[in-house]
Amino acid sequence: MNAKFIVIEGLEGAGKSTAIQVVVETLQQNGIDHITRTREPGGTLLAEKLRALVKEEHPGEELQDITELLLVYAARVQLVENVIKPALARGEWVVGDRHDMSSQAYQGGGRQIAPSTMQSLKQTALGDFKPDLTLYLDIDPKLGLERARGRGELDRIEKMDISFFERARERYLELANSDDSVVMIDAAQSIEQVTADIRRALQDWLSQVNRV
């Protein structure tokens, strides 16, 4: 079986970190031991610096929405070209904490950047490159932010008002419902049930991939 790129997506507080661990463990149980884990924005020395610019406050200067978008895509290109593609070429599976779907939801939905801009930039940065499987953890923004606040201090994006996250979720749902490579998981359930759903979805997908 060729190496695959699997991504975990969702709003703040959806449980992505736990989901990633479940995915990695399930892959290992299926004899897949060579796994590279990534996060976005970030994942390379330069991309982590760009991540800090996106996440941190900038007193006295407003970070423009389009600037935020360009920073995120710059970080993504660095990660895809320097880490993800080389790992896949070596036969390593890649499990990512966020990818392009996050930009479509947060900047396209939350920031309301024009769809034409989003599509053009995506095409320029990524071309036809996309994950083989995306597990989207769906959660009501209010519950997600409640969980996120429980983790401690919020970053610049996590401090956005609830309407921002409602728009982001709406876009997430549009994308999830229009792409067969996206599997939606109800992240409002207990951690035990979410874990079971992730394992089942991944196992079903692996069975299909093995048959091809």
Swiss-Prot record:
It holds the Pfam family Thymidylate_kin. Its EC number is 2.7.4.9. GO terms for cellular component: cytoplasm; cytosol. It is an enzyme of class 2 (transferase). One of its GO terms (biological process) is dUDP biosynthetic process. Coiled coil: none annotated. It comes from the Bacteria. PROSITE patterns: THYMIDYLATE_KINASE. The keyword Cell cycle does not apply. Keywords: ATP-binding, Kinase, Nucleotide biosynthesis, Nucleotide-binding, Transferase. SUPFAM superfamilies: P-loop containing nucleoside triphosphate hydrolases. The keyword Transferase applies. GO terms for molecular function: ATP binding; dTMP kinase activity. ATP binds at G10, L11, E12, G13, A14, G15, K16, S17. Phosphorylation of dTMP to form dTDP in both de novo and salvage pathways of dTTP synthesis. Belongs to the thymidylate kinase family. This is Thymidylate kinase.
